[in-house]
Amino acid sequence: MAAHGQGFDGVERRGLMFVLSSPSGAGKTTLSRLLIERVEGLSLSVSATTRPMRPGEVDGRDYRFVDKATFAVMVKCDELLEWATVFDNRYGTPRAPVEAALSSGRDVLFDIDWQGTQQLREKARADVVSVFILPPSATDLERRLHTRAQDSDEVIRGRMDRAAHELSHWAEYDYIVINQDIDEAFAEVQSILKAERLKRERRTGLTAFVRELQRQLEN
């Protein structure tokens, strides 16, 4: 797990996998977009999927589109960090581009559920930093889902039921952010990322840096 990428202070460090999870409507997608737009050195993980490409989507940008046989080979050869089946389509995170990013000191953002997060921890626990986003109340969550005007009442009821199940996994996460205000929630998430980037064990160039500093002080 050696790293060769320079941090912003010139010290080499290994990148990290920054995971955001939340019930639908709690703000995960908005926070992910803000992080990608405003934080340097962070890229969004691009999943492989067997579902058909939709109008406006670009292969390699939105998803890596593959057929079912190719996906099966990727699973068999352990080429995916995590994968799941959703409505008869398979989705997964290719290992190689993530490893390349981490080794070069770049961080990768994951917008995934608790199951995907669990798989990431099993494959690379030391590289994973997980954040669970909570709404301030069930009433507020339901209001947000209605405000989006994307789903029928039946679909919203289903999302609320799933939210109760997803919430049962909150204690598996490293950090919890209650999204009462999107700007405040973003500031908290950004602070978490900044602190995790500075952790000693990720800054692989610190030993050499300190030795050089000691040498200078002794001369």
UniProtKB/Swiss-Prot annotation:
Give a GO cellular-component term: cytosol
Q: Which PROSITE patterns match?
A: GUANYLATE_KINASE_1, GUANYLATE_KINASE_2
Q: Which residues form the Guanylate kinase-like domain?
A: 15-194
Extract the SMART domains matched here.
GuKc
Question: Which molecular function GO terms apply here?
Answer: ATP binding; guanylate kinase activity
The UniProt record gives the binding positions of ATP as 22-29
State the EC number(s): 2.7.4.8
Enzyme class comes to transferase
What's a Pfam family in this record? Answer: Guanylate_kin
Q: Which reaction does it catalyse?
A: GMP + ATP = GDP + ADP
Fetch the PANTHER family from UniProt: GUANYLATE KINASE (PTHR23117:SF13), GUANYLATE KINASE-RELATED (PTHR23117)
State what this protein does: Essential for recycling GMP and indirectly, cGMP.
HAMAP family assigned to the protein according to its UniProt record, in alphabetical order = Guanylate_kinase
The name on file for this protein is Guanylate kinase
